[in-house]
Each structure stands twice: as structure tokens, then as C-alpha cells.
């Protein structure tokens, strides 16, 4: 899995997550708006004349005290018109009919067609039936008081189908207070006015289920993306580690094929004007072991070997030693090919910093005996001491100037060397192909 594909999957998953979040958020807003409930409170103002103790007749006016109480304790029904209502409060004529569940319930309505308000306790039948029975008796309004649990609570009563009469609910204490006054034959007048508008929001079960499912799906998508991402990341890391191990093995093979020399006293590497090791920035001393790379740069063996294992390139010119030696990461054919660059060229290497770049041969395709190398009719003997001895011919090509040829014999010697190397390279390639097959 390439990095571009992983990034594309990451972007797709992130976009999906954001779109899902916005979609769920909008739907949640819609569900919230759909579940809003609007209801109104009602001010209940009652007025009555309470007789003084010892008075013969209640409401006669003599010795009576006028009481007025007003509180925002009522709540309009769901289908009730939101308007004012006034009238005398009455209950059912008989105690058995006070629940007003029977359509034939009779109320003690005042004479002369005065407006009256029916007071009915909760229970035994629906609010709709109670309100309809009072409406059929020409009540101006219906007041239902709560009974039982949560006596101080009022609700928005549903009474669909009976929408032409004002209907409110009051708490049980207020209702029982009015009932006690009526049982004492005290006339109670009630005035109902509109109170505060309220907007209540409810969370429906449908919206909760939908949001929960959407959230779960969103989390599953995110979790699946995370699992996919980390699996691909793990596979990529493993592949990278395997590649590094293969490259490390190939680097070890390549390092084993590179020439190693021991600096001796009198070698030109020990001279003060010779370049230092580019890794440790120290000069070369006798008995120092150096590694010679295919690019003819040399370094201390202990300095350059760790570098080559990690980077597989020359610290100076960045030449890849695997490519220079023709060793792929899984090469098997190159294991038995010893490399001796100095002997193949007939002399010690020349450092590039000094201005002389030597002409090199692809050592990975040349197999020569370490002691004796035969090139055509030319035999070159390698002395254990790599320093040039008197009488030896060292063939190098300087990048700044061409070496002068002293005679025709020198030209013949160079041509023989080139032809011989070509023949040896061809035969070596054939042997390599046979080993592979």
C-alpha cells in the first residue's frame, strides 16, 4: 500500500466522519424542534364573602369579610382557547356525580342565565368527557383540579373534540380550598386570565434511537478506518524493515568484496599533503587498515564500514557501492567474486581530492587470482607490499593531464592489458550465468 493511497483513505474517512457528524447534528435539531410543546399558564382570581363567626346566613353581607386571592396556579388545556373567562364556581348537584363522567350530570348552575364555571376533580374518565359534559350544561369554563400523586402538579390536558370552551387545571390544594368554601355555601366567583407562555422541549424516543444508531455507525466507520490505517502502517513498517535487512545483507556482501589495505611506512598516504580520512578527519599512519571503495576513495576501515552498512554510499562522492559492484539486494551470484581493485589497476589508489581521478574497471565482473593475474600474454605479479617498487610500471590516467608514453612497447602493453581484461570479463559473465541457471 503506497503512502498516497493511505493518505487518500485517511482523507475519505475524515470527510465521511465530518459529513456524518453534520448530518446527525441537523437531524437532531429537526427532532428537537418537532418535539417542542407550547403551553400557557392561567391566573386564577377567586373572590368570596366569608361570614364572621356566628353569622346566620353566609353571603348576606352583614358581618361578612370580602376575600380576594389571585395566583398563577392554573394551566390551560391543550385544545382550550387561550382567552379569559369569568363566572360563579359550581359543582355537580350530587356527591356521586362530582366526577362528571356521566353525560346526565347536573350542575347547580345559578339562575337568570349567569355565567358559571364547573369545578370537577380529576379521575374515573378522560378530561375530554368531563369537559364535554360540562360544556353540554352551558358552562362558561371548566376547572379540573388534580387528585392523587403530585398534587401540586398541573399538566396540559388533552381534550380533542371539545375546543370551544375554556378549560384549565389547578393543583389539588387550590381545588380543595374552593370545594370547602362551596360546601359551606359560600359563593365563589372566579376570574381566569391568560398567564405566561412557555415553550418546553421533549426528547422523543425516536430521536434518541436514531441519534444512538447514527452515533454507533459513525463510531464503527471511524474504528474501521483506524484499524485499516494501522494495519497498513504496520505492513508498511514491516516491509520497510525487511527492505532494510535485505539492503544490510547486500551491504555486508559488498563490503566483503571491497579491498582492504594496511598502510605501511613510506606510503604516500602517510605524507602530510595527502588528504585525511573524510569520516574521522584524521591522517593516515603506518599500520592503519584502510578500505578502498570502487570510486577509489579510501577511508579507515573502522570508520567507513559502519557508514557503508547504514548508507551503502561513499561518504565523499555518494556513489552507491551496490550499483557499482552490480550486487542487487538478493544477489547470490556475486558471493564468490573476490575484488582487488589495486591489483587490477596495477598500483595504489589516487584520492579524488588531490585532483587525480583514476580510471577504474568494474571489479564485480572480473575474477583474478589474488597472487597472479594473467591478462593475455601479460603477467602481473602482486607484491604483498602495495607500495610501488623500483622498476614497476603503474598505469593511471590523470584527469588533469595524459601520461606521456615513452615508447611503442608501452602502447602495446596497454593495448594487451585492455584486450585481456575484456576477455576475462566475458568469460566471467558466462560463468555467472551458468551458476544462476
From Swiss-Prot:
Q: What CDD domains is this protein classified in?
A: PA_GRAIL_like (cd02122), RING-H2_RNF150 (cd16805)
Q: What keywords sit in the KW lines?
A: Glycoprotein, Membrane, Metal-binding, Signal, Transmembrane, Transmembrane helix, Zinc, Zinc-finger
Task: List locations, semicolon-separated.
Answer: Membrane
- Any signal peptide, and if so, which residues? 1-34
Give the transmembrane region(s): 208-228
Which is one Pfam family of this protein? PA
Q: What is this protein called?
A: RING finger protein 150
Q: Which organism is it from?
A: Mus musculus
Originating gene: Rnf150
